[in-house]
Amino acid sequence: MSEHNIRNFSINFGPQHPAAHGVLRLVLELDGEVVERVDPHIGLLHRGTEKLIEHKTYLQATPYFDRLDYVSPMNQEHAFCLAIERLAGIEVPRRAQLIRTLFCEIGRLLSHLLNVTTQAMDVGALTPPLWGFEEREKLMIFYERASGARLHANYFRPGGVHQDLPPALIDDIEAFCDPFLKVVDDLDNLVMANRIFKQRNVDIGIVSVDEAMAWGFSGVMVRGSGIPWDLRKSQPYECYEEMDFDIPVGKNGDTYDRQVIRMEEMRESVKIMRQCCAKLREPSGQGPIASIDGKFAPPPRREMKRSMEALIHHFKLYTEGFHVPEGEVYAAVEAPKGEFGVYLVSDGTNKPYRCKIRAPGFAHLQAMDWMCRGHLLADVSCVLGTLDIVFGEVDR
């Protein structure tokens, strides 16, 4: 018998690949069609965010968080604001907490809609993204009506939110909920019940409970394996302990389970949005939308026209900023992608001494090599899609 040289070959996936979900470069080592090794090359979107934050006041640093997971920006701002509030002992008014909770759930819809529909597109279905983006457009308009910006909102501020919601916007958000659930049902029938989608996703990228814990997974990646871990229930913040909602969990820990969970989470988010709208209309939901301490939030414009002190507070806030007491704190929120955390160290000045960002996508991407081994080349984009990665937060 003649001897044959068997040689694995390496190919590049990305960084311009449409299924790479950003500027990801994977070096794939293949044995025929079977993946032997995956080497993710990150850093192509690195902007030095953590270092830039050290040179800005706390208020000036907030917009940097919009640019991390730019699919659902307000969830990232939330973690930073919570960290500042815990260090400085700022009391957030109830109305501001309800508005934050409402817009965090809108962010969850924005993220899950993008992920589920582009996952369908990666396996060849072109209709779901069109339906999903139609709904995302409506949600973007809610962002715009609240903050003035569709994407980089800079709406959450230490001590509350930037401005109040007009009553008409609350009515429109509530009116959005019922028709949206119909679209989710349609997507369920079109995508989740589809034979081809199931063939491409069932039993692909299986993660057991122990493996999910060992790799530092969070969010849907953990719940897909059957662990009901959700920071909104296990470590409630803002108004989440008042809300009535369930945590969907998977059985098999595969790609398909994780997408089904994202579909269910959209329904749960709509439940929370309805409750927030109802509570915002109640007498207990009225009141200020930012801390009444003039050191942390700007005074109302009518005050500035009358009071010299208010004008001085405003000037000091936007030039020097406020000083946060010395100390360190870790604040985490249940972002759509997983546990997004901010470890904030203050030296008592008006700028953070250090701000470490814990991005869920970073922990998930490191498991790409282990999850893809033994799968076919065509399954790489399915596994990558189910990790739900955005490079703003991975590269920072």
Curated annotation (Swiss-Prot):
It catalyses: a quinone + NADH + 5 H(+)(in) = a quinol + NAD(+) + 4 H(+)(out). It comes from the Bacteria. It is a peripheral membrane protein. Keywords: Cell inner membrane, Cell membrane, Membrane, NAD, Quinone, Translocase, Transport, Ubiquinone. One of its GO terms (cellular component) is plasma membrane. It is an enzyme of class 7 (translocase). It is found in: Cell inner membrane. It holds the Pfam family Complex1_49kDa. GO terms for molecular function: NAD binding; NADH:ubiquinone reductase (non-electrogenic) activity; quinone binding. Belongs to the complex I 49 kDa subunit family. NDH-1 is composed of 14 different subunits. Subunits NuoB, C, D, E, F, and G constitute the peripheral sector of the complex. NDH-1 shuttles electrons from NADH, via FMN and iron-sulfur (Fe-S) centers, to quinones in the respiratory chain. The immediate electron acceptor for the enzyme in this species is believed to be ubiquinone. Couples the redox reaction to proton translocation (for every two electrons transferred, four hydrogen ions are translocated across the cytoplasmic membrane), and thus conserves the redox energy in a proton gradient. This is NADH-quinone oxidoreductase subunit D. It comes from Methylorubrum populi (strain ATCC BAA-705 / NCIMB 13946 / BJ001) (Methylobacterium populi).
